[in-house]
Curated annotation (Swiss-Prot):
Protein name per the record: DNA-directed RNA polymerase subunit beta'
Annotated family: Belongs to the RNA polymerase beta' chain family.
Protein species of origin: Nitrobacter winogradskyi (strain ATCC 25391 / DSM 10237 / CIP 104748 / NCIMB 11846 / Nb-255)
UniProt subunit comment: The RNAP catalytic core consists of 2 alpha, 1 beta, 1 beta' and 1 omega subunit. When a sigma factor is associated with the core the holoenzyme is formed, which can initiate transcription.
Annotated Zn(2+) 2 binding sites: C810, C884, C891, C894
Entry keyword annotation includes Metal-binding: yes
Pfam families per record: RNA_pol_Rpb1_1, RNA_pol_Rpb1_2, RNA_pol_Rpb1_3, RNA_pol_Rpb1_4, RNA_pol_Rpb1_5
EC annotation from Swiss-Prot or TrEMBL: 2.7.7.6
Cofactor remark from the record: Binds 1 Mg(2+) ion per subunit. Binds 2 Zn(2+) ions per subunit.
Length: 1399
């Protein structure tokens, strides 16, 4: 049988097999080779016959027939004429599908510039020719001539001449003495004339010679593009088009609408304009029209082609009939609706349905309820085939009829088909991978999908009208993956933090909490029971109560597996809970012999999962769900108004606070404190009062009273709900029954007057009005932040999508150090929690005995973590994604444990995407959750340090003075207090704030919880180091200092004002000096005068002539007033960190260790230099704006990395000064802090994976003898490759320094141009890729989705691996054969080779 006929039944041609895709500029010859004919007419179809016009935009001769196997005039019809070209209408008889593939072309009468290479910044044509875009446009749009060949005239090469100048030059020098041209032809000639090799040599020489930085950068840019053209095989003149390709007609269709009108693609309009203008230009040229007319027509042609390629990039946007801009070729690719994001990365799928979800409490964890109607529709093909197999129908048509009639046998078959065939459920928005899970369907009546209550947390679903989509995996492989990887029973742990996500919530928690309550004095207290039957009998007959304290004999096994029985003090409810616990010696009854809150239950599930495995966990979860629901229903807990108990002491607390606030008001009136300080203190006092009232209320609500018989009363219902974690929080209870507290303005500032009422008492009108502020802000925030958070997730996924586990071990010796994170004296993240599931980088030794506890390259399990905390180790070095040395992807050892499975991570796990989802998902969650506390102000300021351990104090860099009041005061910024225990190990170190009051001294013994130091968080002091008398310098009334008299009190306070703006104030340097008895300025012990510089807004605390002692305060600088912290500030903060933006007031960090010296001021900046300790370093200078407070004095000693001026440090500075490890620690801690404030747990490794992706580039400092250009940014991998090459050739290698890129920039600079183009700035990415002739190796996930393959992660990774091995073996076999052939010229059949074993 003929191959063509075979193709009839299998029309899909075999897919091309390719490993890489290359993009480059199309040459005119290339465009012609694609084309099937030239389009000469702008017509589309004939208005009477509706057939395409010949040589028009839809011409059948060029593009192929309209109907399958039928020519246009109808002479040849049917298959048998396949391949014949009709002599009447010249149409080939073939499939009409070719109209989607065949291209045409338009021959342009005059060349035009390709707008992408002209206008997409930086202009490629401009860079190559070294001309500005303005000049290029003047030439292209026929305003100026350009001299190509000056000849012997005085004109210069590439000089621009206007019309008059051109004519004058012709008159002056004669017509043929020089060559000048205009329009795209001129540019084409210039580009053609470039000799790239010579140009490259010239540029390199020029770069060596130049001194100026700016010029060097400019030359580097040009050199880069010249090299790109040289190596890619593109010719510069191809950026000027002489032929325009026309895309196939079925990709720009003309669709008939009812009513005889047509809807057309915008491209047809754009092509029509090009053809019209081109034809007109041809005609004008034939007619030898005047130059000016031809020029105008050429300009219009250029504009038409520009609009076709990228409408609106230059000049006005071309609009259609309805004033809507026409969609050009570039718009087809760009944006959310473009080809990349709409059709290649996101496709609509068949076999799917959606419906509302309802709760299905009787389902098992792996099941979902699917409405029969839906299932029938979704599984239709399977039902047809089964009907056919059973002989119930002979044709598909018959089967269809049976199904439509819903005959009884169809339902039986549906049951069979559905059995063990998982379906996927998805709830939008799918923020992380748990948003799509597989379930086994059970058929139900009705039209709503039933969902298991425990998976709601993963989907973030509730039943207030949410909808979910169902998808059917069709192929066997898909079903297998759904069952093995995506089944809800396989997703028990959260990929972000490794804690269980199948956790009971709401009613279930309440029921379990109620079940585990123990109350005193109930009937039957102290009775002893031997087994469950006795217990149930006693319960039912009312001898004991569910909450009675009893003794019960519990059977369990000891360490050796021997059964033992022990008597346990417990309650009947807890025993019932114990019955569902899996039997294992690792899990004791004590796990549940306590009050079960949500957190406790989560802990138990975690234990069960770790010790008993997945199956047991799933059964356990289902059982406690049933138990919880049943007991919540039995308990009948309700919510009454008397359950909201307003504490007795409330008004007393309110009155004292009111008095305090009044007192602060008075102090302000007396001029003792500033307005800012008063505000801070008042806000502070009220937030303390709110806390106090909340505490009182909690105390009253949580206590249970006993009646005359000693029977303990039932616990308060509201307290039960909040305490168990079922619903509500202490913050909400506080607003119900305590006092609502402080409210925030939309700007984030706190309103000074709090809301004293609570919701039970009711708010006054004024209070209500005040509270609307915060509530409205919350709602507005929610709407805005959801979009922001989604965009953050998208950027994160894009930057990390090609991060995949590709090997087991990269063998690196590098790692990062981990220690516990302590904030305000409390441990917020213990060392154990941070290193769990990570790999040890070096042997971990016991500090006391020096024996090896854990060997290097061990994956830390829970047991190892316990060992470490027992040994009191404070710091552990672990492997990290940041230090992994693999070229592509990350190795399993550096990544550690797969958090969602609790086992070492598998090959092919897409850890980048998981990291991105783990960071992005809570962003959206939190933004949706801002308004829950109604904007009630949550203020947190740290101002004390307390010891966490018992031990002895040692102080490093000690400088303490006893001030005039007899207190000890810290006099330096780098003073560190350490607590050392009896063994001499440092248990904790605290950095002490400048000016803090010390409560301890060197060698003191402290107890746990004892205060070490405290300070005022709202002001920063300027202290004196010497005893003496005060003198002022440059503190001139009205110029640099303003004395404000408080009218009501008559007390003056003096503030330093901005002196730069005042007349004659530019040279002032306001300062306080300390004078000795002789009236001269004293010298400081470390050299320099005792002169203390003041910054703007400093408040003076002393007068001229006052006597001071060391440690006394000379002036105070107020820090900004307390703003509420809320993830609203948090999300932008996370984005700012990931984008590696420089903060507004960036801190200035010392690059070297040395001594501070003040230099001469420069304009209105202070000059500070650091004289290095190390003689080989050079002195560093910093210019600091005058108003900034510099808290260093002349002669202070700073360490490398110390802050000279406070603020948020710029991440780039940290990288440059302290290196990668410090930068990673900074970013991880800052990002974690934002999430921690909201109580969200994210494992550090996710953030590390993203930071690794931000550090992929190297900036070249010295190019050595390589082809790299100093100053350019290049991929680390490429950098290493070129250096290796240079080393092998014995040349000098290049040196570079790592650079930090923000996630957007990093995404746009990935090695794959497909991935970058589908992310943002499509035009720019594609232009650059084409110029460079880039090759996309198709390594990441996105590129493979775009070209329609399996992604190289998960099962796709193993397929890729197998393919790789196969290719290697084939190559080996071929090499062997070639060798054999070379040895034996004409040997008989050689014996079969021994193949290498398959991996």
């Amino acid at each position: 049988m003929n191959q063509e006929v075979m193709n009839l039944f299998n029309p899909t041609t075999p897919a091309q097999v390719f490993d890489q895709i290359r993009i480059s500029i199309a040459s005119p010859e290339k465009i012609l080779s694609w084309s099937y004919g030239e389009i000469k007419k702008p017509e589309t179809i004939n208005y009477r016959t509706f057939k395409p016009e010949r040589d028009g935009l839809f011409c059948a001769r060029i593009f192929g027939p309209i109907k399958d196997y039928e020519c246009l005039c109808g002479k040849y019809k049917r298959m048998k004429y396949k391949g014949i070209i009709c002599e009447k209408c010249s149409v080939e008889v073939t499939l009409s599908r070719v109209r989607r593939e065949r291209m045409g072309h338009i021959e342009l009468a005059a060349p035009v510039a390709h707008i992408w290479f002209l206008k997409s910044l930086p202009s490629r044509i401009g860079l190559l020719l070294d001309m500005t875009l303005k000049d290029l446009e003047r030439i292209l749009y026929f305003e100026y001539y350009v001299v190509l060949e000056p000849g012997l005239t005085a004109l210069k090469d590439r000089q621009l001449l206007s019309e008059e100048e051109y004519l004058r030059a012709q008159d002056e020098y004669g017509q043929d003495s020089f060559t000048a041209m205009i329009g795209a032809e001129a540019i084409r000639e210039l580009l053609k004339g470039l000799e790239l090799e010579r140009l490259e040599a010239e540029l390199r020489a020029e770069m060596q010679a130049t001194e100026s930085d700016i010029k060097h950068k400019k030359l580097a840019k040009r050199l880069k593009i010249v090299e790109a053209f040289r190596f890619s095989g593109n010719k510069p003149e191809w950026m000027i088009l002489t032929v325009v390709p026309v895309i196939p007609p079925d990709l720009r269709p003309l669709v008939p609408l009812d009513g005889g009108r047509f809807a057309t693609s915008d491209l047809n309009d754009l092509y029509r304009r090009v053809i019209n203008r081109n034809n007109r230009l041809k005609r004008l040229m034939e007619l030898r029209a005047p130059d000016i007319i031809i020029r105008n027509e050429k300009r219009m042609l250029q504009e038409a082609v520009d609009a076709l390629f990228d409408n609106g990039r230059r000049g006005r946007v071309i609009t259609g009939a309805n004033k809507r801009p026409l969609k050009s070729l570039a718009d087809m690719l760009k944006g959310k609706q473009g080809r990349f994001r709409q059709n290649l990365l996101g496709k609509r799928v068949d076999y799917s349905g959606r419906s509302v979800i309802v709760v299905g409490p009787e389902l098992k964890l792996h099941q979902c309820g699917l409405p029969k109607k839906m299932a029938l529709e979704l599984f239709k093909p399977f039902i047809y085939s089964r009907l056919d197999a059973k002989g119930l129908s002979t044709t598909v048509k018959q089967a269809k009829k049976l199904v439509e009639k819903e005959r009884p046998e169809v339902w039986d078959i549906l049951d069979e088909v559905i059995r063990e065939h998982p379906v996927l459920l998805n709830r939008a928005p799918t923020l992380h991978r748990l948003g799509i899970q597989a379930f086994e369907p059970t058929l139900i009546e009705g039209k709503a999908i039933q969902l298991h209550p425990l998976v709601c947390a993963a989907f973030n679903a509730d039943f207030d009208g949410d909808q979910m989509a169902v998808h059917v995996p069709l192929s066997l492989e898909a079903q297998l993956e759904a069952r093995v990887l995506m089944m809800s029973t396989n997703n028990i742990l959260h990929p972000a933090n490794g804690q269980p996500i199948i956790v009971p919530s709401q009613d279930i928690v309440l029921g379990l909490y109620y079940l585990s309550i123990m109350r005193e004095g109930l009937p039957g207290e102290g009775k002893v029971f031997g087994d469950m039957a006795e217990l149930e009998h006693a319960l039912h007959s009312g001898v004991i109560h569910l909450h009675t304290s009893i003794k019960y004999r519990w059977d369990q096994t000891d360490e050796n597996g021997e059964p033992i029985k022990r008597l346990i003090d417990t309650t009947a409810g807890r025993v019932m809970l114990g019955q569902v616990l899996p039997k294992s010696q690792k899990i004791s009854f004590d796990a549940i012999n306590k009050l079960m809150t949500k957190r406790e239950i989560s802990g138990v599930i975690d234990q069960v999962y770790r010790h008993c495995g997945q199956k047991e966990t799933v059964i356990f979860c289902d059982r406690i769900m049933a138990l919880g629901f049943y007991n919540a229903f039995k308990a009948g807990i309700s919510f009454g108004k008397d359950d909201m108990v307003v504490p007795h002491g409330k008004w007393k607390i309110v009155d004292t606070t009111r008095a305090l606030a009044k007192d602060f008001e008075q102090q302000y009136n007396d001029g003792l404190i500033t307005h800012g300080e008063k505000y801070n203190k008042v806000v502070d006092a009220w937030s303390k009062a709110t806390e106090e009232i909340a505490k009182e209320m909690m105390k009253e609500i949580s206590s249970t009273k006993k009646d005359a018989k000693g029977i303990e009363a039932q616990i308060n219902s509201i307290y039960m709900m909040a305490h168990s974690g079922a619903r509500g929080s202490p913050a909400q209870m506080r607003q119900l029954a305590g006092m609502r507290g402080l409210m925030a303005k939309p700007s984030g500032e706190i309103i000074e007057t709090p809301i004293i009422s609570n919701f039970k008492e009711g708010l006054s009108v004024l209070e209500y009005f005040n509270s609307t502020h915060g509530a409205r802000k919350g709602l507005a925030d929610t709407a805005l932040k959801t979009a922001n958070s989604g965009y953050l997730t998208r950027r994160l996924v894009d930057v990390a999508q090609d991060c995949i586990i590709t090997q087991d071990d990269c063998g690196t010796k590098l790692g990062i150090k981990m220690r516990a994170i302590v904030d305000a004296g409390t441990v917020v993240a213990s060392l154990g929690s941070r290193i769990l599931g990570r790999t040890a980088c070096e042997d971990i030794r016991n500090p006391a005995s020096n024996e090896v506890l854990i060997e290097r390259n061990t994956l830390m399990e829970e047991s190892h973590v316990d060992q470490i905390s027992k040994a009191g180790i404070q710091e552990v070095k672990i492997r990290s994604a940041l230090t992994c040395e693999l070229i592509n992807g990350i190795c399993g050892k550096c990544y550690g444990r797969d958090l969602a499975r609790g086992t070492p991570v598998n090959h092919g796990e897409a850890v980048g995407v998981i990291a991105a989802q783990s960071i992005g998902e809570p962003g959206t969650q939190l933004t949706m959750r801002t308004f829950h506390i109604g904007g009630a102000a949550q203020i947190n300021e740290q101002s004390v340090i307390e010891s966490n351990f018992d031990g002895k104090i040692t102080i490093r860099n000690k400088a303490i003075a006893r001030n005039g009041e007899g207190h000890l005061v810290a006099m330096v910024r780098n003073m560190v207090v350490a607590v050392v225990d009896a063994d001499g190990t440092e248990r904790a170190t605290h950095r002490i704030q400048y000016g803090a009051r010390m409560h301890v001294d060197e060698g003191d013994m402290v107890k746990r919880g004892q205060r070490i130091a405290e300070w005022d968080p709202y002001t920063r002091p300027v202290l004196t180091e010497l005893e003496g008398t005060i003198g002022f310098e440059d503190l001139i009334e009205g110029q640099s200092i303003s004395e404000t008299l408080d009218e009501s009190t008559g007390i003056a306070k003096r503030i330093v004002i901005d002196w730069r703006g005042t007349r004659g104030g530019a040279d002032l340097r306001p300062a306080i000096v300390i004078k000795g008895k002789d009236g001269k300025v004293l010298k400081l012990p470390r050299g320099g005068d005792a002169r203390y510089m003041l910054s703007v807004d400093a408040i003076l605390s002393v007068d001229v002539g006052a006597k001071v002692k060391p440690g006394d305060i000379l002036a105070r600088i107020s820090t900004e007033s307390a703003k509420t912290r809320d993830i609203t500030g948090g999300l932008p903060r996370v984005a700012e960190l990931f984008e590696a933006r420089r903060p507004k007031d960036a801190a200035i960090i010392a690059e070297i260790a040395g001594t501070i010296r003040f230099g001469r001021d420069y304009k209105n900046k202070r000059r500070i230099s650091i004289e290095p300790v190390d003689q080989e370093e050079e002195t560093r200078e910093y210019l600091i704006p005058k108003g900034k407070h510099i808290h260093l004095q002349d002669g202070d000693i700073v360490e490398k990395g110390d802050f000279i001026v406070d603020g948020n440090p710029a991440p780039h500075d940290i990288l440059a000064i302290k290196g990668i490890e410090e930068l990673a620690a900074y970013l991880v801690n800052e990002i974690q802090e934002v999430y921690r404030l909201q109580g969200v747990l994210i494992n550090d490794k996710h953030i590390e994976v993203i930071v690794r992706q931000m550090l992929q580039k190297v900036e070249i400092i010295d190019q050595g003898e390589t082809d790299m250009i100093s100053g350019e940014q290049i991929d680390k991998i490429e950098f290493d490759r070129l250096n290796l090459k240079a080393q092998e050739e014995g040349k000098k290698i290049a040196t570079g320094t790592p650079v930090l890129l923000g996630i957007t920039k990093a995404s746009l600079q990935t090695r794959s141009f497909f991935s970058a183009a589908s992310f943002q700035e499509t035009t720019r990415v594609l232009t650059e890729a084409a110029v460079n002739g880039k090759v996309d190796p198709l390594e990441g996930l996105k590129e493979n989705v775009i070209v329609g393959r399996l992604i190289p992660a998960g099962t796709g990774a193993s397929m890729a691996k197998i393919r790789e091995v196969a290719v290697k073996r084939d190559r080996l076999i071929l090499d062997e054969r070639e060798k054999q052939a070379a040895i034996v010229p004409s040997a008989p059949e050689a014996e079969p080779l021994a193949l290498p074993p398959a991996e």
